[in-house]
Amino acid sequence: MGKTILVVDDDAMNLRMADVMLKKKGYDVIKAASGQAALTLLQEETVDMILLDVEMPGMSGIETLDVIRTRSELAELPIAFLSASEDMEQAVANGEYAVQGFIRKPFLPQKLYESVDAFFVS
């Protein structure tokens, strides 16, 4: 059975692209179009990783991350932020957020594969 990745992004095109790319590499993909939808899915589904858009209407990726990290069963779950922001990339590199990675948008297939695969290398 493949690893399951929850992709959270308010942009339908980004969700579709990530879904197609990750499934092509053998990952199972669950999609959520908002932070609140992601939190609901996490009560029902078990995932191995989350790709989380930072800038979303309503509940931002940062707010979603904060809620996820308060749940003991999700505290160690690998999460990578998705963003086009260079400032956010630097903030992640500086350890300002409880995430394990950053993927710059728009993401190219090879970069997405390298970033995600790195989380599952034993």
Spans of features found by a protein language model:
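Short acidic/polar segment at the start of the alpha1 helix of CheY-like receiver
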Residues: 11-15
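Charged docking surfaces used in two-component/phosphorelay signaling
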Residues: 16-24
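Helix N-cap/capping motif at the beta->alpha junctions
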Residues: 31-40, 61
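Short amphipathic alpha-helix used as the core "switch/output" element in two-component signaling
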Residues: 40, 62-75
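Active-site beta3 strand of CheY-like receiver
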Residues: 45-51
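Receiver (REC) domain active-site loop signature in two-component systems and cognate sites
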Residues: 56
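Alpha4 helix (beta4-alpha4-beta5 surface) of REC/receiver domains from two-component response regulators
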Residues: 63, 86-103, 110, 114
